């Protein structure tokens, strides 16, 4: 009898815990073949200045609040990148336009780099130095920089010193985007938004407003290879002998005739597209993680999902209260977006443990 009451008490406590859980996402697709690990992201939805971890039911299971001063108004919406470090079970996050921070499970944190323009993406080297993007800077400013572990800038790269004009990289059917970039002039000229490191030590640097990403030799800063023709490129990530990336392709020259054709692209080693996944079914993917099972974990403006290399959706969770098929409706979906950073709500999510 005593065991019955113990079990009943445990069951009631579990039900109350579930009932009181804060839910960020609603899960619409799940599959026995999916990666069942939890998901971490900077909270750009609720208005709370924090990093959160959610389970695959979309419920918050851990959170960490940014200290006062790290987030200024809606700066959190300016490219809050995140990485998970499995060996230390910690998170490295960007407080956009403030710093790159390592956050531990016990709530302690360490600032790894500080810069008033840091955002989007970063790479932490073994010696503690940090390579990071400076996404919204104007022509002539550093688009990427490295700070050593003491906070001193030891390397930088300016797009305009190596790439003289954007127009030679344009010419797609997506005239509306190219027109918007041109109208800004020198403001937000290159829009650095992605970083990865090749096995040979060279850097892969992504420039959205060039619709291209570049392999750069770090000692000289010289561009040794160009990967062009990927409209509004986001998150070019090494995959097999090539890359997986998100593009923002479309047709049309203004809002009235623009048709979204955005997709996840798989390329070969030369950047030639071999496959397009989810074409026309998403709006602005800004996070792609290659998972240990060979699938892709994708973050769009309203959704986190796992897809296999053929584009089959194995897991899909959407911001609570949002239509799960809304993004396939293209720009007509934008007025219906809700959340702190609408319409570009989610930035990047990653799998944890």
Residue ranges, per PLM feature:
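Bacterial N-terminal signal peptides
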Residues: 5-15
């Amino acid at each position: 009898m005593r065991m019955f009451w113990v079990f009943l008490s445990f069951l009631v406590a579990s039900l109350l815990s579930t009932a009181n859980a804060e839910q960020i996402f609603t899960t619409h697709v799940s599959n026995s073949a999916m990666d069942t690990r939890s998901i971490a992201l900077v909270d750009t939805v609720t208005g709370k200045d924090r990093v959160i971890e959610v389970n695959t039911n979309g419920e918050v299971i851990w959170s960490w609040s940014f200290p006062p001063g790290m987030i200024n108004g809606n700066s959190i919406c300016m490219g809050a990148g995140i990485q998970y470090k499995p060996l230390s079970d910690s998170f490295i996050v960007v407080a956009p336009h403030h710093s790159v921070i390592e956050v531990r499970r016990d709530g302690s944190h360490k600032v790894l780099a500080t810069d008033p323009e840091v955002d989007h993406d970063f790479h932490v080297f073994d010696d503690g130095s940090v390579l990071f993007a400076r996404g919204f800077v104007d022509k002539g400013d550093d688009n990427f920089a490295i700070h050593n572990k003491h906070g001193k800038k030891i390397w930088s790269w300016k797009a305009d010193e190596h790439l003289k004009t954007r127009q030679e990289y344009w010419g797609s059917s997506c005239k509306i985007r190219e027109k918007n970039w041109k109208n800004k002039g020198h403001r937000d000229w290159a829009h650095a938004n992605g970083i990865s490191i090749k096995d040979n030590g060279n850097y892969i640097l992504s420039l959205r407003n060039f619709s291209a990403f570049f392999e750069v030799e770090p000692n000289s800063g010289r561009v040794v290879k160009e990967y062009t023709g990927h409209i509004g490129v986001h998150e070019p990530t090494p995959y097999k002998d090539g890359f997986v990336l998100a593009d923002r392709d479309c047709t049309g020259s203004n809002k009235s005739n623009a048709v979204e054709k955005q997709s996840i692209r798989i390329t070969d080693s030369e950047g030639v597209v071999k496959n397009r996944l989810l074409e026309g079914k998403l709006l602005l993917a800004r996070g792609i993680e290659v998972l240990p099972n060979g699938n892709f974990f994708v973050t769009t403006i309203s959704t986190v999902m796992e897809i296999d290399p053929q584009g089959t959706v194995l897991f899909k969770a959407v911001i609570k209260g949002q239509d799960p098929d809304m993004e396939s409706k293209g720009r007509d979906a934008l007025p219906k977006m809700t959340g702190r950073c609408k319409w570009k709500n989610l930035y990047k999510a990653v799998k944890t443990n």
